[in-house]
């Protein structure tokens, strides 16, 4: 989804809306679907907010938990994410797996205190003033980073022009060699 803290600097409220990237169909075929939602988590980073001024006109900052910035503890059962410190994501979405031949391994998951907000999402700094109801954070742990391993079909399979097919300098392959990719749903 398309949302940023910069938008909230000039106005108190913004909407998180779908952000077409052009890779959704490819990722879906490869085995991952980045959902059009936002993760809110009770285990989250804090953001600085101006809460006043000192006598010398310097801004006084206070830090508040911002549920849209989940702090993720990596999967310690995989070499890629083992021994990594907690990761702060900003405006993350959930990732679902889809039917494909790829091996799928969740690398980062939210805490059990997760809430999912489907797009469009009203994002407001006024939420910092409100006490969050823990009962609403009941979605359980959700995948926000996924490792895909295997052979992947080219997005250009069956789409080459006759000129491209005849060109011997183009070493086109319908499928990749065995490889891996990581899909992370961080919105920043």
Q: In which residue ranges do the predicted regions lie?
A:
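Acidic, S/T/G-rich, low-cysteine, solvent-exposed domains in lumenal/extracellular/periplasmic regions
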Residues: 1-188
């Amino acid at each position: 989804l398309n949302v940023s803290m910069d938008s909230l600097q000039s106005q108190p409220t913004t909407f998180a809306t779908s952000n077409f990237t052009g890779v959704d169909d490819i990722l879906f075929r490869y085995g991952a679907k980045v959902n059009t939602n936002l993760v809110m988590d009770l285990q989250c980073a804090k953001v600085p907010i101006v809460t006043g001024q000192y006598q010398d006109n310097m801004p006084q900052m206070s830090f508040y938990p911002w549920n849209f910035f989940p702090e993720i503890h990596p999967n310690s059962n995989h070499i890629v994410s083992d021994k990594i410190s907690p990761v702060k994501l900003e405006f993350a979405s959930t990732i679902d797996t889809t039917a494909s031949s790829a091996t799928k391994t969740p690398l980062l998951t939210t805490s059990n205190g997760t809430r999912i907000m489907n797009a469009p999402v009203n994002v407001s700094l006024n939420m910092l003033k409100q006490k969050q109801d823990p009962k609403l954070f009941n979605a359980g742990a959700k995948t926000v980073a996924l490792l895909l391993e295997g052979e992947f079909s080219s997005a250009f399979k069956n789409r080459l022009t006759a000129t491209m097919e005849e060109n011997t300098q183009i070493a086109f392959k319908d499928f990749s060699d065995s490889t891996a990719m990581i899909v992370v749903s961080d919105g920043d």
